[in-house]
Amino acid sequence: MQNVQSLMMIITSDTYPAKRNSNTQKKLYKENKNTNEMAVWYSGGGLDQNEKFIYDSLNRDLKLKCSDDSRQMGQKTILAFEWAIENVDFKYLIRPTPSSFVNFSYLKGLYKEKLDDKDIVYAGTVQTIEYENKPKLIFVSGSTLILNKQCVELIIKNQNKWDHSLWDDVALSKLMTELEIKL
C-alpha cells in the first residue's frame, strides 16, 4: 500500500472534454517524482459482475463498476473513495475535475496553516446554490474539494444518506450538513 500525504482523485469520463483534459493533466501529474503525492483518474466503466474496480498503475486509471454517465458522479465518487481507503494510505484526498490545476506546494502550506489541526477536513472553494425552493445550500465546488482521511471514511460509512438526485459536490455538502460537519 502506497503511503502519501496527498492523494489526488480526479473524476473523469470517456467523453469530451473530460478525456482531453485528463490527458493534459496526466502530462503534468503522472510523472511527478514526489513520492508524497499521487494522482489517480477515475471513471465508470463496463466491468464484469465480479469486479468492483480495476486499477491501471502505469496510467493511473481507475475504472469503477458503475455507469460513466454524468448523473452517476456521486456513485463514482463513493466507489473511488472506497478504493482509496482500501489501497492508499493518505492523509488528504484532493478531488478536482479534469480541467483543474492542483498546486501541491500551495496545499502543503494550507495543510500546515489551516487543516492539520482539524479532526474532520471538508474544505475548498465555497459556493452557494438554491434548488427546489429550499434554503440556500453552501457547498464546496467539486473542482477544489479537499478532504482528510477521517472525512472520507465518514462519507463511506454514511453513503446510504447520499442524495444521488444532486450533483456530487452538492450532494456531499448536503451529507456533511446532515452529519454536522462544518466547512
Q: Which positions does each model-derived feature cover?
A:
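Conserved, well-structured core segments
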Residues: 7-11, 39-40, 144-146, 174
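Active-site-proximal specificity loops/subdomain of glycosyltransferases
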Residues: 40-91, 101-105
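Short, acidic, metal-binding catalytic loop of nucleotide-sugar glycosyltransferases
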Residues: 3, 21-37
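A generic secondary-structure signal
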Residues: 27-31, 79-87, 110-113
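Conserved catalytic core of nucleotide-sugar-dependent glycosyltransferases
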Residues: 68, 74, 92-96, 100-183
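Eukaryotic intrinsically disordered and solvent-exposed regulatory patches
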Residues: 25-27, 49-50, 77-83, 132-133, ...
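N-proximal low-complexity "stem/linker" segments adjacent to membrane-targeting elements
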Residues: 1-23
